[in-house]
Regions:
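Non-catalytic peripheral regions of patatin-like phospholipases
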Residues: 207-209, 213-252, 267, 317-361, ...
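Helix-rich "cap/lid" substructures immediately adjacent to catalytic or cofactor-binding pockets
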Residues: 248-298
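A small-molecule sensor/coupling module
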Residues: 25-27, 44-79
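Catalytic nucleophile loop
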Residues: 272, 294-313
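Cyclic nucleotide-binding regulatory domains
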Residues: 1-35
Length: 545
């Protein structure tokens, strides 16, 4: 038999837990991608330890709960729509359909096409025209009857201009599994009006429509929309130059995001909190860019939101490293103070410095305008629960998520008292499931914590121990909290990247470059295994060696 991967585990994880409930011994091969120390415990010894060591008992029950959650949670298999309708608000970028169809064909798909074009720019082995020989629209039932012979075709694309009367569009779109509506800023108003009219005639269309917004030239983010998101389930952005190419290297996979969505293989990355240690996320993202590892969805808590939202807005990770290093560098007056970098951070929170800094780069952009969908996590002290934000002001989403309790006053608005989301969900991988990700990678900068604190280690005699000051204590409390609470949001994670940033302080923003380098190192080490898992997800989309 050909061996296959049963499970991929990381630091502090276990396997074989369910073997406690039966005597049968099932052999399994274990391969490691790095040097590690493993502990093997026989079944009888494990049972005896349950009665002898309370901490072992608690940890085992916690691990069992997570294992049962995974066992009873259905595997995330993305939906592959068979009939895909592509609506165009302008003839100018009809070539987008050709690009998508040819890409699907390059992946081995047999694609049939129904189109209202008079030319033959859309090529497929099987095609039907919506126009008769006089150039008039054919009866939809007639077209449907002709297409009935395509029962074995795995993908059918309906390519049509959005200038038809609403009754005709409603009729031809009824059988569609998903609807991609392509438009730019010049056609957004008429597109919005038509989509609302279509959704009134065909209410089920609200669950099928995804926006495809065309961004031109140097346009970094999409224009704001008023109400269109209420009638759609997805929102793609493509930087388009008219020839199927993207204009910005950091967002060049706009078309590929649509392809992955159609194939049910969307990739999500969850960026965890960790204050300055979160600068490691930028190193991770830089390697993903260089190696062509796709990102379809992003979520982030605290530092994950601070780094992830600007990246989702199209800023290059290398530029962000330099910008954070400069923008968060303490001024000279703090250099002569004990723990001056900590006092600088407190002043930045209490003096409103974060808002000014963020809006210099994010302006008044909203999360809906960003190239990559982003969900930030904050905590509401009124309801004592998480708040997930996928829309609204981008800078405010960061401010809410990084708002450290005790350092900065809570943000009070709309019946909520908002503080740093890390107190409830420090690595929000679970958020990505509801966003539609079928493969989820967590980036955890709090996983590794050194056993040295304020000059003390586990072997330091009592009479030689140092008493930590307030800043050291607050920082260590947060690091310990982040490390232990991280598992709450990572139960749905398929893979984890853990940069070792334990040598850096939580206020070490001026060392962003060195911290980011740890993200680079961890991601380079993780790449072979990550590629292997992506290939298992979709061998055609991810043909990695």
């Amino acid at each position: 038999d050909v061996p296959h991967i049963i499970q991929v585990i990381g630091r502090s994880n276990q396997f074989g837990l369910l073997g406690l409930f039966h005597d049968d011994q099932n052999p399994v091969n274990v391969d490691t991608t790095q040097n590690l120390t493993g502990l093997a415990i026989k079944r009888q010894d494990a049972i005896e330890l349950l009665n002898q060591v309370p901490r072992w008992h608690r940890n085992l029950l916690g691990a069992l709960g997570m294992r049962l959650h995974q066992a009873f949670t259905p595997k995330r298999i993305g939906h592959r729509p068979r009939l895909v309708a592509i609506l165009h608000a302008s003839e100018e970028y009809r070539h987008l359909s050709t690009t998508l169809i040819r890409r699907l064909q390059s992946l081995g798909e047999d694609v049939a096409v129904i189109s209202d074009r008079e030319d033959t720019r859309v090529t497929a082995k099987r095609s039907i025209s919506l126009l008769d020989k006089h150039g008039n629209l054919r009866n939809p039932n007639e077209v449907r009857s002709e297409a009935s012979s395509w029962a074995t075709i795995e993908r059918c694309v309906l390519d049509i201009q959005l200038d038809k009367n609403i009754e005709y569009l409603n009729e031809v779109l009824q059988d569609s599994d998903t609807i991609l509506c392509c438009f730019d800023s010049n056609t957004s108003q008429e597109t919005e009006s038509l989509l609302f009219e279509l959704s009134e005639c065909h209410p089920a269309a609200r669950k099928k429509i995804s926006l495809v917004r065309i961004l031109r030239g140097t346009q970094q983010v999409a224009d704001p929309l008023k109400n269109m998101h209420s009638i759609c389930r997805g929102d793609f952005k493509i930087h388009w130059d008219g020839f199927g190419q993207s204009c910005h290297t950091t967002r060049k996979s706009g078309i590929e995001r649509i392809i992955r969505n159609l194939r049910g293989s969307s990739i999500g990355f969850a960026l965890g909190g960790g204050a300055a240690r979160g600068m490691a996320h930028l190193g991770v993202l830089s390697v993903l860019d260089e190696e062509g590892i796709p990102i379809d969805f992003l979520s982030g808590t605290s530092a994950g939101a601070l780094t992830g939202i600007p990246y989702a807005a199209g800023y290059d990770s290398t530029w962000l490293i330099e910008t954070f290093s400069q923008d968060l560098k303490p001024s000279k007056r703090y250099k002569f103070l004990p723990y001056g970098d900590a006092w600088y951070m407190i002043g930045k929170f209490r003096g409103g410095g974060w808002d000014d800094m963020l809006r210099t780069h994010l302006f008044d952009w909203t999360l809906e305008q960003l190239s990559i969908p982003f969900t930030s996590v904050t905590a509401d002290l009124v309801a004592a629960e998480q708040v997930h934000r996928s829309g609204g002001d981008a800078a405010s989403a960061i401010l809410e998520s990084i708002n450290l309790p005790g350092v900065s006053p809570p943000i009070c608005q709309n019946g909520r008292v908002l503080v740093d989301g890390g107190i409830l969900n420090n690595v929000p991988a679970d958020v990505l499931v509801t966003q539609g990700a079928t493969f989820i990678v967590a980036v955890d900068v709090a996983a590794k914590i050194g056993h040295m604190f304020a000059g003390n280690d586990p072997t330091t005699p009592t009479d030689q121990m140092n008493t930590p000051n307030m800043f050291q204590t607050l920082g260590r409390v947060r690091a310990a909290q982040d490390r232990n609470i991280r598992k709450m949001g990572t139960q749905d994670t398929d893979f984890t990247i853990e940069p070792d940033v334990s040598a850096f302080q939580l206020t070490d923003f001026q060392n962003a470059s060195a911290i980011a380098q740890q993200g680079v190192i961890a991601t380079r080490e993780a790449l072979p295994q990550l590629r292997k898992l992506l290939k298992q997800l979709d061998p055609e989309l991810f043909p990695y060696a």
